[in-house]
Amino acid sequence: MSVKASSIAAFALFALASAPVHAQALPKGDPVRGQTLFAQCKICHSLEAGKNGLGPSLKGITGKKAASSAGFKYSPAMTASGLTWKAAVLSEYLTAPMKKVPGTKMAFAGMSKPQDRADVIAYLAKN
């Protein structure tokens, strides 16, 4: 292998090794179990359109732009986040809300188990 070819190969290997690792696919969610898990979310959130509490209504949240529920005063960080609540983004956010959106008003440490997140997301998708 020539010096030029080995340099190109080394660069390609470095670029590949430096590429970001993408989040693993979510497990299949169980909306019935998700409803049970959602009990902890109901302390601050409702699933009734327009009924905000300490947190915004989560009615129809999947596929919506972040900070778009009418009548709720979002943090500047959430308003500027540019997020759309797809399943993968919801999972990242529910893992560690304050890490995903530094400055969010959501005072929740996060949900560490992928299956729990998938179940809650499946439940939200049905509401």
Functional labels for PLM-detected ranges:
Residues 84-127:
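C-terminal capping alpha-helices of c-type cytochrome domains
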Residues 45-51, 63:
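Detector for the c-type heme attachment site
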Residues 68-91:
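Short Fe-S-cluster ligation motifs
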Residues 21-38:
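Electrostatic cytochrome c docking/interface patches
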Residues 7-8, 14-23:
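C-terminal segment of classical bacterial N-terminal signal peptides
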Residues 33-36, 53, 57, 73, ...:
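Extracytoplasmic/secreted proteins, especially bacterial periplasmic and envelope-associated proteins
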Residues 1-4:
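N-terminal secretory signal peptides that target proteins for export/translocation
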Residues 34, 39-47, 120:
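The canonical Cys-X-X-Cys-His
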